[in-house]
Regions:
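Catalytic NTP-binding/metal-coordinating core of nucleotidyl cyclase/transferase enzymes
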Residues: 71-150, 198
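Amphipathic alpha-helical transducer elements in NTP-driven molecular machines
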Residues: 204-208
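Hydrophobic transmembrane alpha-helices
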Residues: 1-16
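Regulatory cytosolic signal-relay segments
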Residues: 15-77, 103
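Catalytic core of nucleotidyl cyclases, primarily class III adenylyl/guanylyl cyclases
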Residues: 115-147, 163-203, 227, 257
Length: 296
């Protein structure tokens, strides 16, 4: 902008002898108008970029182009929900400074968000020590069950390695709990015109959240719901589908649901052949599943 203004001043100085005063005024006005338009465009782009860091980019674009409204702006779609949280984080906060806990949480959110987006998903919400992501929501994702599992596997592997060692604090280690399920949900904006929220609603969201909360009880860090297993084509006696080895853990009555649901996990969280795979298998063997009364 300063460059345009300087150029206008120089042009006016150079052309004093060749242009009439009216022409010089018109030229200066045109250059200043271009400068103002450029400044306005930069401000709009900055506002949009900042807004897109708080909500997903497609939602930010809609907000920027539409007037506020009291109406429901949502659509029904088939998608996969991935939710993940930090286990034992509340206890960790009691023994660490606010700066350390903020750094740990920031690193977790940043790394998990990057991995989710790299696999075709979008983070819809972050609250407390948890986040919720959607595959095939605002951004199309044809193979959303497989993409969500790949993202969950990467999060468990990479984000777990970034968690601080709590041994010196004498408390249980930080760990991750992940829940995934597929189904239909309403995704969009709700609320009054002066205070809107973008979220998703549906049983698939409840299922993913309850599966995540069940991970400590079952001692499996990642749990899959029946909707996701069905879309993968999992059948009794044939759990190996599309290079994803699924293990059926049994029937469980999840909180808030009326009927028991089949719960699954990945036999191997890491890619087959990974050096850490044997450590994962050893961990799972040392932490048996829930009491047999739950299994089916």
């Amino acid at each position: 902008l300063l460059g345009l203004q300087a150029w206008a001043q120089l042009a006016q100085h150079w052309m004093l002898d060749t242009l009439s005063p009216a022409a010089l005024i018109a030229l200066s006005a045109a250059l200043l108008t271009l400068g103002e338009q450029a400044r306005t465009q930069l401000e709009k782009q900055r506002i949009y970029t900042n807004l897109a860091s708080y909500v997903t980019a497609p939602v930010a674009e809609k907000i920027a182009l539409q007037a506020p409204t009291d109406a429901i702006q949502a659509r029904r779609c088939e998608l996969t929900v991935l939710t993940v949280d930090l286990k034992n984080f509340a206890r960790y906060c009691q023994d660490c400074s606010p700066e350390d806990t903020a750094t740990t949480l920031h690193r977790f959110f940043a790394s998990a968000s990057t991995l989710i987006e790299a696999h075709g998903g979008m983070v819809e919400e972050m609250w407390g020590d948890s986040l919720l992501a959607v595959f095939n929501g605002e951004r199309p994702c044809a193979d959303h069950p497989q993409a969500a599992i790949a993202a969950a596997r990467a999060i468990w592997q990479q984000c777990s390695a970034q968690l601080p060692n709590t041994q010196a604090l004498g408390i249980e280690p930080l760990s991750l709990g992940l829940g995934l399920d597929s189904g239909h949900a309403m995704i969009g904006s709700f609320g009054a015109a002066q205070r809107r929220v973008h979220t998703l609603l549906g049983p698939v969201v409840t299922s993913a959240l309850q599966l995540r909360s069940l991970t400590p009880e079952l001692a499996y860090p990642l749990l899959l719901g029946p909707g996701l297993a069905q879309r993968l084509g999992v059948q009794p006696g044939n759990p190996h589908i599309n290079h994803i080895d699924i293990k059926h853990l049994g029937q469980f009555l999840l909180p808030g649901l009326l009927q028991p649901s089949s719960v699954y996990t990945l036999r191997h969280l890491l890619q087959p052949g990974d050096a850490a795979e044997q450590r994962t298998i050893a961990y799972l063997r040392q932490h048996p599943t829930a009491p047999a009364a739950h299994s089916g």
